[in-house]
């Protein structure tokens, strides 16, 4: 599922598959300038050619009479024209600059709320300022070219929203209700309009339609069938009456005109928090935002793990093995195989992963779970060659140890265990988050050791979980792996899940191995 989150435009490339973030780069500017130059050259050369070969007046008159009457281009939507003209004075471009030199690092959009000096945008537009306020500073540019300072007031990482204060006030076009029940209900197919500054080319409006709430996202998002481009992150999406429907946030890279919005109800809730405690908001230091982001991520991981374990893991059969998976609205599973008579070995692979993750920074997305199972067998390879093949695969799937300034060095433990007639090697590694002390990445990898020409490798990855929840899920995953009848395995998994849910108290959790992140 290739998606693009509408990030502030920056000089870095979009992130990996998933909701990727819309950035502008210097190369984009170059391509645009090059295209413009070529168009000018073509126009000039066309004019010169016309001067060299002029059509006689009589011939021109005859040609005009013979030529079919040209049809005018369709007029642009009058609704879009009127909305843009009414809204333009309250649209802003949000720029993130390096403090040292005040050079542009990234660009997004935002909108003034009512007649206040509060502006709504995306968290990912302001993430650099929230995480590294000593390095980055913000400014706004309005549709008339006026500039001013930007002060970050509040963030909602889970829904990708932020509220900032600027040095000017709105005209009152973008009205946000005080309560969520005052928001207009959207109906599928109705026209919506997204506004922002795409590609740093200038302010624009795009027209599309509303097509429901995305069921596979962990938090509600709206599907907008219309174009949204880099730099429109944080811009408003409104209905034909100018009422807020949502905030531009991302688009799908694998489809046409499949874009996503943060629902307006989350805008209302964040503004309520800002307006309810203005003194506390004003007194916040830059360090408070890192702590607040950590608190929200911790809240997400609790919800994520509880959702994962709210019912027993599903069990699927791969040859003689029973393997745990989770299929839900938030997690999808895919399979592939290389079954062909000429292959020296055959594999079947299952991959399950969450459809979304939480954006913290361009380098860090977290709050994510994935499960992989890789079953191989061979008749043509001898046991030695087959064993070597699986050793190489095991090492390749471990991903190696990479240095990462955001995480601590991995602390790993390895054990050989017997579980439900299945002997296996298990390696678990844990890395801590440097900025967020209570969060860890867990990686658990297993390899069966019970057969010479048949092999199962499994992997569980948990990103951004507490140490207690990480060990809790890893223990349950290990207990669910094994052999035996499907009914017996399902019963076993159900009991294991129930026991794990009863052991939510960290003091009751018994770790399968003594692992601490350094």
Language model regions located:
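Extracytoplasmic
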Residues: 86-91, 105-108, 114-116, 120, ...
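Conserved active-site neighborhood of the chymotrypsin/trypsin-like protease fold
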Residues: 114-195, 200-203, 218-221
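Secretory pathway targeting signatures of secreted, lumenal, and periplasmic proteins
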Residues: 331-387
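N-terminal targeting leaders that route proteins to membranes or the secretory/organellar pathways
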Residues: 20-82, 118, 479-487, 492-498, ...
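Surface-exposed amphipathic alpha-helical segments
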Residues: 268, 278, 330-331, 444, ...
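Signature of long, low-cysteine stretches enriched in small and polar/charged residues
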Residues: 388-449
């Amino acid at each position: 599922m290739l998606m693009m989150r509408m990030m502030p435009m920056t000089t870095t490339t979009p992130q990996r598959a998933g909701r990727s973030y819309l950035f502008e780069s210097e190369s984009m500017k170059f391509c645009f300038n090059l295209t413009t130059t070529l168009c000018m050259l073509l126009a000039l050369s066309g004019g010169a050619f016309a001067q060299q070969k002029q059509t006689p007046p009589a011939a021109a008159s005859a040609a005009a009479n013979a030529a079919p009457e040209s049809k005018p281009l369709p007029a642009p939507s009058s609704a879009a024209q009127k909305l843009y003209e009414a809204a333009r004075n309250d649209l802003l471009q949000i720029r993130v600059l390096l403090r040292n030199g005040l050079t542009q690092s990234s660009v997004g959009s935002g909108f003034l709320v009512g007649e206040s000096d509060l502006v709504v945008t995306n968290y990912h537009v302001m993430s650099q300022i929230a995480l590294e306020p000593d390095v980055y500073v913000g400014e706004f540019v309005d549709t008339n070219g006026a500039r001013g300072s930007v002060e970050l007031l509040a963030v909602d990482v889970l829904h990708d929203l932020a509220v900032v204060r600027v040095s000017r006030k709105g005209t009152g076009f973008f009205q946000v209700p005080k309560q969520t029940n005052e928001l207009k209900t959207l109906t599928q197919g109705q026209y919506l309009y997204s506004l922002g500054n795409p590609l740093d080319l200038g302010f624009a409006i795009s027209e599309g339609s509303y097509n429901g709430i995305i069921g596979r996202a962990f938090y509600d998002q709206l599907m907008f069938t219309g174009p949204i481009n880099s730099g429109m992150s944080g811009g408003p999406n409104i209905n034909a009456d100018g009422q807020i429907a949502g905030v531009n946030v991302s688009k799908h890279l694998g489809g046409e005109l499949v874009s996503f919005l943060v629902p307006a109800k989350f805008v209302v809730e964040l503004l309520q928090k800002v307006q309810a405690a203005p003194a506390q908001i004003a007194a916040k230091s830059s360090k408070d935002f890192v702590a607040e982001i950590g608190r929200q991520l911790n809240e997400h991981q609790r919800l994520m793990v509880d959702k994962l374990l709210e019912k027993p893991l599903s069990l699927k059969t791969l040859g003689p093995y029973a393997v745990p998976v989770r299929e839900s609205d938030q997690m999808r599973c895919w399979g592939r195989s290389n079954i062909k008579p000429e292959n020296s070995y055959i594999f079947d692979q299952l991959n399950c992963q969450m459809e979304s993750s939480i954006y913290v920074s361009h380098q860090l997305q977290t709050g994510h779970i994935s499960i992989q199972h890789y079953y191989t067998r061979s008749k043509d390879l001898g046991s030695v060659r087959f064993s070597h093949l699986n050793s190489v695969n095991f090492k390749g799937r471990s991903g190696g140890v990479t240095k990462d300034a955001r995480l601590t060095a991995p602390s790993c433990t390895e054990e050989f265990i017997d579980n439900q007639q299945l002997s296996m090697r298990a390696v678990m590694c844990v890395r801590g988050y440097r900025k967020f002390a209570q969060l860890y990445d867990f990686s658990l990898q297993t390899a069966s050791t019970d057969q010479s020409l048949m092999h199962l490798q499994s992997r569980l990855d948990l990103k951004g979980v507490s140490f207690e929840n990480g060990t809790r899920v890893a223990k349950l995953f290990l207990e669910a792996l094994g052999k035996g009848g499907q009914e017996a395995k399902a019963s076993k998994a159900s009991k294991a899940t129930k026991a794990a849910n009863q052991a939510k108290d960290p003091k009751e959790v018994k770790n399968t191995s003594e692992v601490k992140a350094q």
